[in-house]
Amino acid sequence: MTSVKRAVVFSGGGAKGGYQIGAWKALREIGFEPDLVTGTSVGALNGALMALGKYEDARSIWENMSMNRVFSQFVEDTQAQNLPPETLFKRLAREVLRNGGADISPLQELVKSLMDEDALRHSPIRFGLVTTRFSPIKAVELFIEEIPEGEAADYVLASAACFPFMKSYQIGNVKFVDGGYSDNMPVQMAVNAGATEVAVVDI
């Protein structure tokens, strides 16, 4: 008799990542306990939090998410001028063009504060993500045991580097961009890892 291996797959989806928490809640309610979770972009962040068992943290993040928590001093400066949203976004677009992507330092700090790498490596839920190596473009699929020690948070951020809106994310000498450029819904990654039942959360 073939043993069942359950997986959850979180797609990329940017600001819609909060909807994945609703799906996570539903999976908890029906008792769907995954053996592994894979994710791309914002799905990599939510997937890591699932592997860590941080449902309440994930829910709190998305309930309180605002531009201030994603972008840097740029938002504080423009909001202090009491600008309408249309003007704010136009200025943000100009910053993206001028600087090669928006500065998302607050988001980076938030992700790094949440990533308990030791717990992630020893979680009963195996975690995997997709990112994209930049220039030349190449898909990169990694499970937690393949990620170098001390770089788990960096690879989650690399998976979510929504270039060109955000800057590419550099790890060592290599630049990465959003995993959605390679595989926005890493179902096959889960199947290749032995998943026989897959819950796909596509937003």
Model-derived features: positions:
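Patatin-like phospholipase
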Residues: M1-T40, A48-I203
